[in-house]
Amino acid sequence: MRLLGRYLRLGSPRLCSRVWPTLPPSCSPHSTAAAAQAQGALSFSDGGVFKLKSSWEVARGLLIFRMCSFPSLVKHSEKMLSVSRRLLGRRLFEWGMKGSVYGQFVAGETLPEIRVCVDRLRQLGIHPMLAVPIEEDLGQAKSGERWYEQNESIMLDCVDLSAAGGDRPMMQLKITALMSAELCKLLSVHLSHPSNGPQLCPRSIVSIMEGKESAFSFLSEGENSHLRNSVRRLSRIAKHATANRVRVLVDAEYTYMNPALSLVTMAMMSQCNQSEPWIWNTYQCYLKDSFSLLSLDLDTARSLGLCFGVKLVRGAYMDKERKLSKQKGYADPIQHDWEATNRSYQRSLDKMLDLIGQNGQRHNLIVASHNEESVLHAVTRMAELGIDKGSGSVSFGQLLGMCDHVSLTLGQAGYLVYKSLPYGSVDSVLPYLIRRAQENQSVLQGIRKERDLLRRELKRRLFNQR
């Protein structure tokens, strides 16, 4: 498969989020009883869900989560891994990584390894969501188109792998693997000016995707050429995914490029989402404007007659976003505290669930969260609204190697639950894992409950307890 050998690539812990105790007036006694039954059937405190894991997997998870609870280890992980590689040599270092951190959080490198991971998840009632860990930030721009063209081939392979992974396949996509971050930032700056609205719109991007040699006056000749190449790459991937019935979840990234990402994603939706939501966008609820952005995009999709899919997350770039806002002197885009983020998440969650309750064919949602209260709230509202947990209109998502007590419980209860599966070589994936660990330190330090459940399960096995 194209370039598979070369590259063969997470939300938050249970904290203090609140589940609204009162039910909407519209809820009938039947829906109230169904909600209570649905919530009562789920227990995230039962370590028995780990019975399907091997003792090695339980011990490895316990050790890694314990290590991740030390901020200094996470902060200096890149330097320590670099030293380890020099001392051990490539082969021994890779062997150690595959038995530890890489093995915990990555699906594998080769096609057989990925298939083993996917098959194991399916036995546990969990669906795979493949993710290629390739992205670009400012200052990392590549010269020419070759790197982006190679990434297109890798993404097309990811579509094929996802399609072969079973029913209702999903995959993640980072636009900055196919379009430079510098161009995304430039487009985002121009999108902030209302006068550029008529020029920079989904329709104009679609026309370029379909072959029109358009050029924007605020872009140089080289930038216009790169834009044309980039959106056509994205169009080819979107159409290939739609033809293979693979849902593509476009990841959000940093606020200084997100407007451009949403513009291009809406253009992809315009091409593919007439009858079903094949292309989805991601909304980061730790941003103060996340609900208004979701509402605006819903209105745009409705005006274009499009189906709409949403990946709902809290967000992973908080520290960098706050640091940038201080450096550049603009308002902090992040919610002022954790509770505000929780309220934002629940507000967007309720909006999408209400729409799905009205028409689950045209609206889809993945509750991409490690937060137990958010998951329980979604389960409760699904029951109240009569949303069939097996219909596919609502699913749940967590990262591979994390929050397994939630994923396994949901899967065994018949809910559609996905694990985000990065895959690739140790060299290609480790930078991604290091970045995510550093960006999600608060998550990694807060997984005490999962550590306790793993410790209890390991103790049960060691002492042969029932």
Swiss-Prot record:
GO CC entries: mitochondrion
Keywords on record: FAD, Flavoprotein, Oxidoreductase, Proline metabolism
Cofactor: FAD
Flavoprotein found in the keyword field: yes
Pathway in which this enzyme or protein is active: Amino-acid degradation; L-proline degradation into L-glutamate; L-glutamate from L-proline: step 1/2
Gene3D superfamilies per UniProt: 3.20.20.220
Pfam families assigned to the protein according to its UniProt record, in alphabetical order: Pro_dh
Gene Ontology biological process terms from the UniProt entry: proline catabolic process to glutamate
InterPro entries per the UniProt record, alphabetical: FAD-linked_oxidoreductase-like (IPR029041), Proline_DH_dom (IPR002872), Proline_oxidase (IPR015659)
Single GO term (MF): oxidoreductase activity, acting on the CH-NH group of donors
Annotated SUPFAM superfamilies: FAD-linked oxidoreductase
Record has Oxidoreductase as a keyword: yes
E.C. code: 1.5.5.3, 1.5.5.2
Catalytic activity, reaction form: trans-4-hydroxy-L-proline + a quinone = (3R,5S)-1-pyrroline-3-hydroxy-5-carboxylate + a quinol + H(+); L-proline + a quinone = (S)-1-pyrroline-5-carboxylate + a quinol + H(+)
UniProt function note: Dehydrogenase that converts trans-4-L-hydroxyproline to delta-1-pyrroline-3-hydroxy-5-carboxylate (Hyp) using a quinone as the terminal electron acceptor. Can also use proline as a substrate but with a very much lower efficiency. Does not react with other diastereomers of Hyp: trans-4-D-hydroxyproline and cis-4-L-hydroxyproline.
Similarity comment: family membership: Belongs to the proline oxidase family.
Protein name, entry field: Hydroxyproline dehydrogenase
Organism: Xenopus laevis
